[in-house]
């Protein structure tokens, strides 16, 4: 309806299929058009899509507010990209953002009662007070789920547009935006239509350095080198070698887990994917994070041809 059509900085959000469908149905209702079986089917299709998203990312309680929070977390626009890992600065762009957040606050409190009566369903009311079935952690993005639900509660509690703005600015400062903000590690995937994609690694083991017994001097060297890298100081490339089971992969995971909050991200690349490295660097070069390129299974045999 007119709320969504007035989004400017977050205008791409209005194109998301669930939000767009609900806006069209609400607009039709307000113009006095009858909502029959075909419209009800469209509503159910939108609800199903939202439920699929909720299952993938572990939404719970108020799925509608979780969904809106997720859209805000994922929208890479001039404001959010500037604010990632530093927070919102002072500038005229903030006026556009504040207007958009005023709309999102209204969407957070949106009353679906009239639309439900017109459609003859209560599906939207169910979404706003939802109890998800217990599911294994591997079925959803655990780390993303926690962030979505925490942000959703904070935004729902915002008593003013200014408080809403501060909450989102703090989120972008703490985590960033989009897939790089919400995820710590990535792998490459070759898509015939879209080319090379950076895909988040789901639910990476939450190991810490304390889980590695021994290797104290090696762990300390990794820490010092990583911290220098994060500060923008000179740091070395690192070669981890040793027999299978000696903690090489665990050390990498521990580094990423420990320094994720400081903006460290890891991209896993295999030997046969080296030809895509320039494309990867082009995608990440203007983002406000520090990336480790993790190359596994390197070989230094005399007859190695690659």
Task: Place the predicted regions along the sequence by residue.
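Long, positively charged binding patches that form subdomain-scale interaction surfaces
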Residues: 169-174, 210-213, 221, 227-228, ...
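AAA+/P-loop NTPase substrate/partner-engagement loops
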Residues: 257-291, 298-302
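Phosphate/oxyanion-binding active-site loops and adjacent basic polyanion-contact surfaces
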Residues: 214-218, 248, 273
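Substrate-engagement module of ASCE P-loop NTPases
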Residues: 306
């Amino acid at each position: 309806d007119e709320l969504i059509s007035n989004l400017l900085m977050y205008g791409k959000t209005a194109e998301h299929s669930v939000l767009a469908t609900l806006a069209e149905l609400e607009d039709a209702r307000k113009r006095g058009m009858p909502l029959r079986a075909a419209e009800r089917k469209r509503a159910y299709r939108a609800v199903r899509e939202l439920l699929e998203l909720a299952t993938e990312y572990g939404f719970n309680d108020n799925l509608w507010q979780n969904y809106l929070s997720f859209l805000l977390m994922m929208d890479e626009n001039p404001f959010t990209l500037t604010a990632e890992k530093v927070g919102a600065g002072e500038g005229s762009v903030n006026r556009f953002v504040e207007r958009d957040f005023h709309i999102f606050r209204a969407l957070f409190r949106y009353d679906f009662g009239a639309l439900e009566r017109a459609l003859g369903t209560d599906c939207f009311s169910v979404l706003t007070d939802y109890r998800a079935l217990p599911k294994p952690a591997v079925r959803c993005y655990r780390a993303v789920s926690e962030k979505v639900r925490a942000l959703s509660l904070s935004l729902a509690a915002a008593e003013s547009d200014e408080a809403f703005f501060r909450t989102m600015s703090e989120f972008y400062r703490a985590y960033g935006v989009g897939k790089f903000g919400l995820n710590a590690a990535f792998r490459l995937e070759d898509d015939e239509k879209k080319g090379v994609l950076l895909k988040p690694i789901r639910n990476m083991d939450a190991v810490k350095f304390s889980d590695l017994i021994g290797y104290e001097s090696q762990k300390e060297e990794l820490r010092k080198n990583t911290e220098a890298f994060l500060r923008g100081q000179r740091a070395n490339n690192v070669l981890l070698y040793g027999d299978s089971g000696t903690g090489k992969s665990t050390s990498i995971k521990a580094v990423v887990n420990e320094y994720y909050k400081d903006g460290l991200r890891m991209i896993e690349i295999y030997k046969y994917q080296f030809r895509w490295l320039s494309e990867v660097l082009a995608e990440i070069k203007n983002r406000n994070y520090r990336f480790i390129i993790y190359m596994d299974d390197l070989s230094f045999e005399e007859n190695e041809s690659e």
